[in-house]
Regions:
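Preference for protein termini
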Residues: 1-178
Length: 178
């Protein structure tokens, strides 16, 4: 999982009436996890981020999507992309920002790639929250330990200081067609 493109979009844009971060997420392949793995991931996330269960976004309740009937059948990548976006919003919220909505959509003709829209007050914090979200979910999927408290402390410091965060720096604001 990685971000392959990012842009800061100005106040009035196609996706939001407020500034937002447009990121293209590449999951690596179209169906990264089975239904059982996604259920385990949601359970583990609920333990480390209890506010995530109450979180809603423009797309509905976290993970609110039809899953395959067979327990080991692959899920569509959209479910994982939505979860990454929802975790990023929750992490962003934990810095004191009131961001509560976002958008996730598939990139046409590019299986495994998703457009994530994260409204923000501070673009650097949105970028760092998304980077932390991907790292957390990647670690949980690999069953590796992850120091979320250290990540949150760094995220809060970025929010307090306005210093550049981890991850690639998005391009300057520019109109995006499509």
């Amino acid at each position: 999982m990685k971000i392959v493109d990012q842009r800061y979009l100005g106040s009035a844009n196609r996706y939001s009436t407020e500034p937002c971060l447009l990121s293209i997420l590449d999951l690596g392949h179209p169906a990264p996890a089975c239904a059982a793995t996604m259920a385990q991931l949601r359970d583990r996330l609920a333990k480390v981020l209890p506010g995530l269960r109450r979180g809603r976004s423009l797309i509905g309740i976290v993970g609110d999507e039809v899953v395959p009937e067979e327990p080991d059948a692959p899920c569509q990548g959209l479910q994982l992309a939505r979860l990454i976006q929802s975790v990023a919003i929750e992490l962003h919220r934990l810095t004191g920002d009131e961001v509560m909505v976002g958008f996730v959509g598939g990139v046409p003709k590019m299986d495994g790639r998703y457009r994530l829209i994260l409204p923000f007050r501070c673009g650097t914090v949105a970028n760092a929250a998304l980077t932390l979200s991907i790292a957390l979910i990647d670690a949980l999927l690999k069953d590796e330990s992850f120091d979320l408290e250290a990540g949150l402390a760094q995220l809060r410091e970025i929010a307090a200081n306005g210093t550049p965060g981890p991850g690639p720096a998005p391009q300057p604001t520019m109109p995006i067609a499509a």
